[in-house]
Amino acid sequence: MNINVANLLNGNYILLLFVVLALGLCLGKLRLGPIQLGNAIGVLVVSLLLGQQHFTINTEALNLGFMLFIFCVGVEAGPNFFSIFFRDGKNYLMLALVMVGSAMVLALGLGKLFGWDIGLTAGMLAGSMTSTPVLVGAGDTLRHTIANNPALQHAQDNLSLGYALTYLIGLVSLILGARYLPKLQHQDLPTSAQQIARERGLDTDSQRKVYLPVIRAYRVGPELVAWADGKNLRELGIYRQTGCYIERIRRNGILANPDGDAVLQVGDEISLVGYPDAHSRLDPSFRNGKEVFDRDLLDMRIVTEEIVVKNSNAVGKRLSHLKLTDHGCFLNRVIRSQIEMPIDDNVVLNKGDVLQVSGDARRVKSVAEKIGFISIHSQVTDLLAFCAFFILGLMIGLITFQFSNFSFGIGNAAGLLMAGIMLGFLRANHPTFGYIPQGALNMVKEFGLMVFMAGVGLSAGGGINSSLGAVGGQMLISGLIVSLVPVVICFIFGAYVLRMNRALLFGAIMGARTCAPAMDIISDTARSNIPALGYAGTYAIANVLLTLAGSLIVIVWPGILG
């Protein structure tokens, strides 16, 4: 049996789509030295190549892909979006605005200088900033514009070409910039990280290991009673001195949970809960009492839960204010905008932060009720909320403003982004509403992006040869300028106008570029996870601003041309 592959693919849009995705994802796994191409650029390159062979895809698939991606970006940004405006939030907002604004101005200027159309200009901006939200925002606005001006169809095709030509330039230049720019300024990054750590009392260890607490039981001997010297448990401060706390006491055969007034007596059997290294450092007075195996003493269900910060008595407060150890709980991680933060008593909590806490199930539940709620451990998505807010986003996108003879529509990208932010924010405040498992959210977001990339590549591939020869060199130079110059501008603005600590500043700059690989390099250079504070500060707001920038550059383009 003879199978004509070309006819088979052209006659089956779904098959063509998944062939493009599979080949593109394979290509995206290739590495050029330390640089991995990535899924987005892999799918785009394959779709451009197949597009040259006149393979096409239904445009509705492209539209659905970008809609899912943008909506998920909003959902992820929602929990921490509004907290950006507190504490250092003003600085982070201004840095993100400077980064996105300067990049957009440079792209517009270079586009006019070289005589490009808006498709190449917006694509170059998206690729240089390694930002798919820019590409998606520009693509959505262009589609609405093309409906009124079919002559712009070529600009739509050029959008993916500009992105493909400049993406690697943007990624490689930023990674090299992250490695070498900190060395060109006069302040040492590790010193800056230690300085902010001293000012805020933060732990600078970027390689902190996390263990689950364990429980062991001991019989109280004379040495331990002598060490206690008649003090009750509150006066002794067992946790401060040992890193463990006493969960239970058996005295005269009676098992009880002790309060702070309890005094240790010879013959008591106590269960101690703490991290393994805390047990190993116990004062000899504890270990000299015989370790015992008592099923009831050791029968404690230690759980690890993710607690979402919500309540006013925790938001804006330092970790020390929670006094987790006084409640017999252990903090393993602090996560903000999917970024792991430094763990220290002086870290200030934002609404939507996630605390990973271990301890007795009853104690963890009690702590969760005081500071927020335990994140749902479910694989079931609240599809009703997902669909309802998706519809709301599409309805918002239909809103149009009329100014004299000029009309401006919000568009699907901005509408879905706003609806996603609302859903994410409400989810962070209401534990049973709008739950989407992180794995499901990541899958929908990634799949939507890949479908969008496949669509724009197949649509543009037919005209790539004619455009590539004319603008290839200009694109590479422009991509380098738009990638690095805004980083330098942000550094000057942050260092000399905002006077930010350099470790926080470089982390914030990488967050404004939403580039995790560059952030890893900054943390390695600083030998600290302090820069993650800055990265988390700008990351959420930058994703939103970059999407809006993609739409805005298309809207203002006619005015730039004069």
UniProtKB/Swiss-Prot annotation:
Gene3D superfamilies: Regulator of K+ conductance, C-terminal domain
GO molecular function, one term: monoatomic cation transmembrane transporter activity
Transmembrane segments: 8-28, 32-52, 66-86, 94-114, 118-138, 158-178, 383-403, 406-426, 447-467, 475-495, 541-561
All residue ranges annotated as the RCK C-terminal domain in the record: 202-288, 290-373
Membrane protein topology class: Multi-pass membrane protein
Subcellular location: Cell membrane
Keywords: Cell membrane, Membrane, Repeat, Transmembrane, Transmembrane helix, Transport
UniProt record, GO biological process: potassium ion transport
Coiled-coil segments on the chain, per record: none
Gene Ontology CC terms: plasma membrane
Top-level taxon: Bacteria
Family the UniProt entry places it in: Belongs to the AAE transporter (TC 2.A.81) family. YbjL subfamily.
Protein's recorded name: Putative transport protein YE1478
